[in-house]
Amino acid sequence: MLKKFDKKDEESGGGSNPLQHLEKSAVLQEARVFNETPINPRKCAHILTKILYLINQGEHLGTTEATEAFFAMTKLFQSNDPTLRRMCYLTIKEMSCIAEDVIIVTSSLTKDMTGKEDNYRGPAVRALCQITDSTMLQAVERYMKQAIVDKVPSVSSSALVSSLHLLKCSFDVVKRWVNEAQEAASSDNIMVQYHALGLLYHVRKNDRLAVSKMISKFTRHGLKSPFAYCMMIRVASKQLEEEDGSRDSPLFDFIESCLRNKHEMVVYEAASAIVNLPGCSAKELAPAVSVLQLFCSSPKAALRYAAVRTLNKVAMKHPSAVTACNLDLENLVTDSNRSIATLAITTLLKTGSESSIDRLMKQISSFMSEISDEFKVVVVQAISALCQKYPRKHAVLMNFLFTMLREEGGFEYKRAIVDCIISIIEENSESKETGLSHLCEFIEDCEFTVLATRILHLLGQEGPKTNNPSKYIRFIYNRVVLEHEEVRAGAVSALAKFGAQNEEMLPSILVLLKRCVMDDDNEVRDRATFYLNVLEQKQKALNAGYILNGLTVSIPGLEKALQQYTLEPSEKPFDLKSVPLATTPMAEQRPESTATAAVKQPEKVAATRQEIFQEQLAAVPEFQGLGPLFKSSPEPVALTESETEYVIRCTKHTFSDHLVFQFDCTNTLNDQTLENVTVQMEPTEAYEVLSYVPARSLPYNQPGTCYTLVALPTEDPTAVACTFSCVMKFTVKDCDPNTGEIDEEGYEDEYVLEDLEVTVADHIQKVMKVNFEAAWDEVGDEFEKEETFTLSTIKTLEEAVGNIVKFLGMHPCERSDKVPENKNTHTLLLAGVFRGGHDILVRSRLLLLDTVTMQVTARSSEELPVDIILASVG
């Protein structure tokens, strides 16, 4: 008997779990009771509960002791006590992976599975399938087929769900049960129909045509189960995505028809599916939004929450589509459920007008302290979107954010606010000084190291450009005096950036850095000593290279190259150009983690996509002498349609003097295998094809890779743009789709692919230059050239900027890819590295009259990159 605990025990937490202090050895000793006769069902069930508790708490049972306990437990099948029998089933499932020879209970389970006691049959099916492997499955196949079509819903559902689990290890056997599953799918029981539909889909999911037929059949005859409808909607939406989402498809019509279903869960599932379809227009969203609007006034909190959460998601891409719901959303602002109220307000922030912002901010302020950090982050994200939409409201929004920043909150919440403030500072120069001042106040009492170092990095980047940079020095130096070593190191870096950009402040900065040289921490001392020595040289090029812009190489690549250098001693100094560059995504204009990463690196930095390619190419003998990989194209280029018999995608790899084309090939014909697959290429310009590395075999639906090696132009090095015609050549061998047997004889064949373009962007790696002016001075004007062009087909500055960035493949610096409103002039600043490791910078001045006139000035450490830029633009 378990003792009864009083309320005091419950509140203190003492004794709330009677199984809390179990010992494995004691429990296994108790399990010997299973061998006693007569069987005591209540006592044995309690011991089984203890064993299950130990297993689920992660207690390790040795194979021998688990097997002994399991064999003892099998004797409990002699008892007809229903509770004890159900506990036996649970124990069999849990111990099937630990104990040996668990198949000893097969006959007992089969007997229960085919017996007259319905309460035993379903659990017996589940337990039997848990201990059955692929070799034994055929022995119980007949029983499984009978169970699937059983008239008792619990038995049928158990068999269907167990079949779904068995698919992973015995697909071919379970596939033979499709007829029984089809019969079960017409059941009147909602769970049986749902489980049968799930099994049918998973058997056929790799055959798109079979899935389409299944959807067509069940949508035509209708379904009784709302769960089955929900699953069918998900299958149909997945199929729509794979078919590039044609809205004329009967699949879309089916999903839309489900908006009129009598079950609320089906209606919501259909609305959610339409909302999440890629490329959905506002017109196609309208019926889904109307349904969600009705749910907003539902008496059920779950429906109101689901509706407003989904509308919030729609408002991110299609705010105009949600505008019709604004009145309903305003009613939800006062909802008693704070989660619903928060989502309603953030949705209104995305869809509301500029005039409603002040009122909404007051409403948010009234309950911000009552909601969780998770929803506070949602509010901050909505405010961030609002800042971009209504720049004139920056002042109101900034004040609200600063108030939130001063309140209590967790890391994610504070980080979201800091992100938002930084984006406002970068978007709106008028709010820069106000924003920096508030961030300075925040780091005076900031408990989060990551945020403190990030703000210090921002101060070092933006502070020197303000009207009165000296006012930030006190806040930064306070961090050196008061904080721990990571923040102190970030503060030292920020101080150095002020000294590198402001000659008047340099003497004061040098004094502060000299004090930091005596710091207790190695990192802080090393930084201070390094920056002190660089600044004392008073050379702009050194300041730019070692303080303001820093390294642009990949950290894992640098680590690997240094390790290789130490393993193979050489008299030559280490060449930094042999290290792959850090690829910077176009969307990431802010160097958010630079300061933090410099202070404390994570234990293991994940290899980038380019580093993975580097390893793969280094393993090919033909590419051994090519040197380090400079760049891989960001996205593979499709050279065939996705529905054709062969799917070919090409990735371009650039080396200092060569290009390697990697062709990822998939054979979608199940009655043939391709061998010795190569892609023959013919260039239109001065490129020279050197060799081909074939894919030895390309069986049905198994990807393979072949390569083509090409030498870059030598006679005219500026002729880097080129078009290659491509033909795939291979040997075809027929094979039996059922057995996979391949014919010995084959025949030669070829397949014409789309042409492949090589552009100037394939020869340039984009890099971030935080301080473009310093980088410009660092490169110098020795190899500077300038030309003026007219872009006759372009009518706006935004279009011109977008085209130039895409064409040159360089990184826009200092947010110069954002064109201010109502301006007819703009300067675009671009940075990159040309193959071979040569910095290349471009300053493009744009003037809009009737057409766009562009003055391009290019600088590099070598003449060739400058010539290539101007030749390609011309």
Curated annotation (Swiss-Prot):
Name used for this protein in its record: Coatomer subunit gamma-1
TM region(s), chain numbering: none
Region: Interaction with ZNF289/ARFGAP2, residue numbers: 609-874
Quaternary structure, from the entry: Oligomeric complex that consists of at least the alpha, beta, beta', gamma, delta, epsilon and zeta subunits. Interacts with ZNF289/ARFGAP2 through its C-terminal appendage domain. Interacts with EGFR upon EGF treatment; interaction is essential for regulation of EGF-dependent nuclear transport of EGFR by retrograde trafficking from the Golgi to the ER. The coatomer interacts with KDEL receptors; the interaction is important for retrograde trafficking of KDEL-bearing proteins from the Golgi to the endoplasmic reticulum. Interacts with COPB1. Interacts with TMED10 (via C-terminus).
Residues recorded with modification Phosphothreonine: T594
Source species taxonomy: Eukaryota, Metazoa, Chordata, Craniata, Vertebrata
Function: The coatomer is a cytosolic protein complex that binds to dilysine motifs and reversibly associates with Golgi non-clathrin-coated vesicles, which further mediate biosynthetic protein transport from the ER, via the Golgi up to the trans Golgi network. Coatomer complex is required for budding from Golgi membranes, and is essential for the retrograde Golgi-to-ER transport of dilysine-tagged proteins.
Pfam families linked: Adaptin_N, Coatomer_g_Cpla, COP-gamma_platf
Positions of region (Disordered): 1-21
HEAT repeat extents: 64-101, 283-320, 322-355, 356-392
